[in-house]
């Protein structure tokens, strides 16, 4: 009816809603003036012009529920309180981030046991890792778009369900092929988990706080980095499928908590805008390009020579595809009107440098974490569990240094000096590790890991705040998704390049001995997976193989030294931007409140959906 408006009151945090008829007088009464601002005063001119006659309009009250103790909302200036609601969401996000990070690196320690328990296959063992990383990288921009289209809750929950399905496939796999497929499904969900955790935390925290909370996230990754080889070693010695079964109870608990408590309202989009946000063409080109590059670097030097067409053709196609992707994203066109990587993300010098440093940090962190257990198993005759314990000096310093860096950013709002310190420690630590050999002493391998771990820990929480400080709030989702993509893309190159250098060098230097080694199971395809079995080789061939492995591992570490130096010098190109103490996000956390039927002022904290007939010409 023209003289009656139908008002739906949605109680945040609950799936049910109810409707009541409200007269125009009630909506405009003085008692409710603060709770329900007169429509359409809360809409911009552009919003008014895009409204349809039936469109539901979300009206946000001027006096909103506080979300944190010490921050002000960037629009209303209201004090925000982090109550139990917030901490439940935060805890659930940290749990699923932990299991996703765990599965990213835990497989490296258990790889020899998995290889020994599955039927022989022509699939290279490092594809178990690559199959996880490829969809993980490609899915992060997609979930960034989904978070705007279907909302934060269903994006993160969808990613979690996909990850758990992949875990079941991996745990029940009886062949290498099925295991690789399961890892691919896991990676698809894992990419969404990583991207959405950072987007949601950016919604709920201020730029100043973000250093602290991302320090906690870094702590989670550091704990996962230490726990992964330990758990991988334990499970590989008893039952390797539990590497994947362990994800189910943790994931199920988190899923229930997020369904109940996570209710973040994002700006309304039309159906067309939602599709545009997904950027299907751009994401398809990116996925194909990353796939081609990963095939080339994974198979190069192992299954085929680097000069073979089977390697350089996909490599060239992948690099050309990346160039095409950038053209699609950066040149205005109808194919990608709302690109996942808009050009303005990289027009700001500070943001661009931070993205480069995020990539380099991902390369070094994941490459080193993957290679260190191989050194201890192959050279020092350690079991998977023992190699994890001997890797503790690398992970242990990451805990306090990540948290310390986050706290310092939160207190001072400064980050450049910390970044300089992080790169210096990383360069010193990895430089020392290039001198590891068969006879390296405990002091040398332990202390060099401590130095590197401190630098890696410092860098975890401090590259995202300058990115978000340099860009407008409207770019938060795309900027954060690009950050997650950049770091994981670095992980792909770090793990793949390190294992490729190691495998190529070891295979090349072992070929003269293959007449003795092939009957024992060592070949170009099994160089990485065979590391645990070196201690079972007869003398003197065991000493020869250990020397070759030690040199190959040292060669892989040399890759990271110039990267750390580059990271240090790029810091001079950053500006020390202020980190304001307000929430820089267009999304809002909805909290459960009591709503009275009379719509008194106590209902000011509710989210009201007003469905009304909108005149064709709005004032």
UniProtKB/Swiss-Prot annotation:
It is a multi-pass membrane protein. Disruption phenotype: Impairs the secretion of mannosylerythritol lipids (MELs). One of its GO terms (cellular component) is plasma membrane. PROSITE patterns: MFS. GO terms for molecular function: transmembrane transporter activity. Residues 45-61 have a biased composition (Basic and acidic residues). It is found in: Cell membrane; Vacuole membrane. Residues 1-74 are annotated as: Disordered. MELs not only have high potential as eco-friendly biosurfactants due to their excellent surface activity, but also have attracted considerable recent interest because of thei runique properties, including self-assembly, anti-tumor and cell differentiation induction activities, and moisturizing and hair-repairing properties. Pfam families: MFS_1 (PF07690). InterPro entries: MFS, MFS_dom, MFS_trans_sf. Keywords: Cell membrane, Glycoprotein, Membrane, Transmembrane, Transmembrane helix, Transport, Vacuole. The chain crosses the membrane at residues 87-107, 131-151, 161-181, 184-204, 211-231, 242-262, 278-298, 311-331, 359-379, 389-409, 418-438, 450-470, 482-502, 552-572. It comes from the Eukaryota. GO terms for biological process: transmembrane transport. MFS-type efflux pump; part of the gene cluster that mediates the biosynthesis of mannosylerythritol lipids (MELs), surface-active substances that enhance the availability of water-insoluble substrates. Mannosylerythritol lipid production is responsible for hemolytic activity of Ustilago maydis. MMF1 is directly involved in the secretion of MELs. Belongs to the major facilitator superfamily. This is MFS-type efflux pump MMF1. It comes from Mycosarcoma maydis.
């Amino acid at each position: 009816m023209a003289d009656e408006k139908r008002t739906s009151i949605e109680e945040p945090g609950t799936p049910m809603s109810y409707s009541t008829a409200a007269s125009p007088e009630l909506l405009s009464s003085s008692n409710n003036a603060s709770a329900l601002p007169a429509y359409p005063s809360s809409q911009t001119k552009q919003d008014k012009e895009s409204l349809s006659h039936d469109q539901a309009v979300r009206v946000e009250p001027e006096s909103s529920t506080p979300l944190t103790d010490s921050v002000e909302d960037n629009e209303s200036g209201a004090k925000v309180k982090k109550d139990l609601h917030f901490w439940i969401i935060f805890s659930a996000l940290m749990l699923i981030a932990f299991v996703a990070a765990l599965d990213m690196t835990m497989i490296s320690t258990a790889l020899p046991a998995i290889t020994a328990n599955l039927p022989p296959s022509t699939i290279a063992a490092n594809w178990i890792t690559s199959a996880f990383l490829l969809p993980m990288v490609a899915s992060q921009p997609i979930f960034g778009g989904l978070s705007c289209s279907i909302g934060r809750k269903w994006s993160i929950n969808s990613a979690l369900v996909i990850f758990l399905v992949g875990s079941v496939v991996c745990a029940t796999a009886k062949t290498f092929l099925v295991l690789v497929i399961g890892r691919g499904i896991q990676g698809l969900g894992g990419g969404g988990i990583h991207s959405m955790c950072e987007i949601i935390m950016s919604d709920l925290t201020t730029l100043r706080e973000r250093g602290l909370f991302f320090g906690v996230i870094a702590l989670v990754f550091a704990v996962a980095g230490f726990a992964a080889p330990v758990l991988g070693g334990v499970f590989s010695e008893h039952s390797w499928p539990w590497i994947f079964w362990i994800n189910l109870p943790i994931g199920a608990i988190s899923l229930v908590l997020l369904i109940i408590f996570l209710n973040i309202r994002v700006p309304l989009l039309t159906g067309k805008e939602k599709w545009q946000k997904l950027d299907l063409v751009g994401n398809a080109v990116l996925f194909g390009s990353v796939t081609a590059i990963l095939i080339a670097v994974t198979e190069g030097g192992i299954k085929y020579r680097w000069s073979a067409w089977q390697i350089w053709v996909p490599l060239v196609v992948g690099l050309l595809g990346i160039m095409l992707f950038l053209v699609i994203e950066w040149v205005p066109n109808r194919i990608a009107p709302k690109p996942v990587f808009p050009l303005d993300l990289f027009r700001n010098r500070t943001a661009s440098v931070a993205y480069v440093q995020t990539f380099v940090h991902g390369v070094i962190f994941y490459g080193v974490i993957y290679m260190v257990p191989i050194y201890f198993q192959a050279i020092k005759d350690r079991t998977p569990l023992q190699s994890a314990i001997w890797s503790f000096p690398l992970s242990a310093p990451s805990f306090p240094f990540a948290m310390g860096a986050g706290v310092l950013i939160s207190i001072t709002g400064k980050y450049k000096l910390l970044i300089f310190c992080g790169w210096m420690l990383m360069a010193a630590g990895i430089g020392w590790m290039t001198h590891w050999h068969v006879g390296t002493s405990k002091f040398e391998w332990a202390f060099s890991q401590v130095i590197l771990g401190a630098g890696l820990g410092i860098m975890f929480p401090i590259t995202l705040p300058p990115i978000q400080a340099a860009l407008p709030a409207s770019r938060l989702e795309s900027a954060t998704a690009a950050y997650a993509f950049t770091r994981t893309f670095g992980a792909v190159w770090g793990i793949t390049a390190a294992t490729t250098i190691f495998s190529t060098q070891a295979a090349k230097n072992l070929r003269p001995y293959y007449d003795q080694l092939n009957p024992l199971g060592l070949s170009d395809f099994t160089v990485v997976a065979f590391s645990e079995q070196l201690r079972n080789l007869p003398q003197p061939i065991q000493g020869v193989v250990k020397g070759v492995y030690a040199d190959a591992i040292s060669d892989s570490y040399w890759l990271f030294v110039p990267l750390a130096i580059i990271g240090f010098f790029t810091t001079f190109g950053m500006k020390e931007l202020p980190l304001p103490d307000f929430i820089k996000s267009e999304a809002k956390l909805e909290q459960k409140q009591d709503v009275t039927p009379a719509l008194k002022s106590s209902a000011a904290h509710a989210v009201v959906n007003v469905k009304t007939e909108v005149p064709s010409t709005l004032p």
